[in-house]
């Protein structure tokens, strides 16, 4: 993250642009987030997984900034992870559960020294999240 902004293209950043070009922003977000490329690019990747283990040691201002960023990410994810018939609270709960699975898989994949297992973690989570969301 540079100056608080991601440098890599992500459907999180501009869902309407992905929809305008005929893409499913949820499917693209899942595929991008749970990719070996994102796993390898720690410096420019998701700050939620990059700083999660250290955030409690930050001063109150740093902790507040992390919390604001996480809330913003969850809000963006809830926008692209909509499902018919869900109320606002249900949509947010669904987004939190899905994003938590994705972040946990990315974190575990980054921590594992065995490349085959690291890939298996990403592949399993990607398949599960796609099946639970119906994302293409």
Q: Model-flagged regions — what are they?
A:
Residues 32, 50, 76, 107, ...:
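Alpha-helical scaffold segments in soluble metabolic enzymes
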Residues 1-5:
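HTH DNA-binding helix-turn interface
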Residues 6, 10-45, 88:
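Hydrophobic alpha-helical connector segments
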Residues 24, 59-68, 81-136:
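Hydrophobic/aromatic-rich alpha-helical bundle segments in the mid-to-C-terminal region
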Residues 29, 33, 48-52, 98-102:
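Short alpha-helical scaffolding segments that buttress acidic/His motifs in well-ordered protein cores
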Residues 12-19, 37, 55, 59, ...:
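Short amphipathic alpha-helical interaction patches enriched in hydrophobic/aromatic residues
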Residues 25-28, 40-67:
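Amphipathic alpha-helical segments used for helix-helix packing
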Residues 70-80:
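Active-site oxyanion/phosphate-handling segment shared across diverse enzymes
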């Amino acid at each position: 993250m540079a100056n608080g902004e991601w440098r890599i293209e992500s459907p999180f950043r501009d869902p309407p642009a992905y929809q305008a070009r005929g893409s499913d922003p949820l499917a693209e977000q899942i595929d991008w987030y749970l990719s070996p490329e994102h796993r390898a690019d720690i410096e420019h990747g998701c700050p939620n997984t990059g700083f999660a283990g250290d955030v409690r040691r930050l001063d109150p201002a740093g902790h507040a900034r992390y919390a604001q960023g996480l809330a913003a990410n969850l809000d963006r994810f809830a926008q692209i992870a909509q499902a018919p018939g869900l109320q606002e609270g249900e949509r947010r709960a669904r987004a939190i559960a899905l994003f938590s699975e994705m972040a946990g898989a990315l974190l575990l994949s980054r921590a594992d020294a065995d490349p085959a297992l690291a890939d298996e973690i990403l592949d399993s989570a990607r398949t599960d999240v796609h099946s639970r969301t119906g994302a293409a």
